[in-house]
Design a protein with these regions (language model features):
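HTH-adjacent hinge/linker in prokaryotic transcriptional regulators
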Residues: 1-60, 64-65, 94-105, 111-112, ...
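Hydrophobic alpha-helical segments, especially N-terminal targeting/anchoring helices
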Residues: 6, 75-76, 157
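Conserved amphipathic alpha-helical segments that form helical-bundle/coiled-coil interaction surfaces
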Residues: 59-95, 103
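C-terminal regulatory/effector modules of DNA-binding transcriptional regulators
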Residues: 63, 80, 91-93, 100-184
Length: 184
């Protein structure tokens, strides 16, 4: 099964089992672009890159309160906004892999740029929660404020356990998340 499918009713099913391994497929600049193209969609992302402080819970995962690179993305399939994604990258990672602070991170996206710099992610944990939409999220996604939205907090770690990326994905209504666990 492809990692994303879009049903005739607009429901997006995200299958995480192969999502990150296929991030550079067809020259894609990350998992979202690759999976959207595989599903027959037209991916687009509006990207802003800044430096600043991560929220306290994200800073705790990253191991400190120092400056981070913040990549804010609005991600579309065609003209439909399907998710908001904010990525927080420690400054030392951005110094080692400067392309992560660029608007265009190249084929394979930030995960590939980190790997190129010797900071390959070998473990990813994604926590899925429901959170009330903030006024800004509600306006962007066309829902009422406080509408419960699925949020995925993605943490990428290196082989030695260092968190090198935390991305918070806030999904528009209509998503199904599918996870598989090998039993061998």
């Amino acid at each position: 099964m492809p990692s994303n499918t879009i049903g005739s009713d607009g429901t997006i099913t995200r299958d995480a089992r192969s999502r990150y391994r296929q991030r550079a497929e067809g020259g894609a600049h990350g998992a979202f672009e690759a999976e959207t193209k595989r599903a027959g969609g037209t991916p687009r992302a509006d990207v802003q890159v800044d430096r600043g402080q991560a929220p306290a819970d994200v800073a705790a995962i990253l191991g400190g309160t120092g400056e981070v690179v913040i990549r804010r993305r609005r991600m579309y399939t065609g003209e439909r906004l399907v998710q908001l994604a904010d990525t927080y990258i420690p400054a030392y990672v951005a110094e080692a892999a400067p392309a992560v602070a660029q608007l265009d991170t190249g084929t394979g996206g930030i995960i590939s740029r980190m790997a190129d710099a010797g900071l390959a992610q070998t473990d990813v944990v994604e926590d899925v929660t429901q959170v009330p939409a903030s006024p800004e999220q509600a306006e962007a996604l066309g829902v009422e404020p406080s509408t419960l939205l699925l949020t995925i907090t993605h943490t990428g770690r290196t082989e030695d356990g260092r968190a090198v990326e935390v991305t918070r994905h806030v999904l528009s209504p209509g998503w199904t998340l599918r996870y598989g666990v090998p039993l061998d």
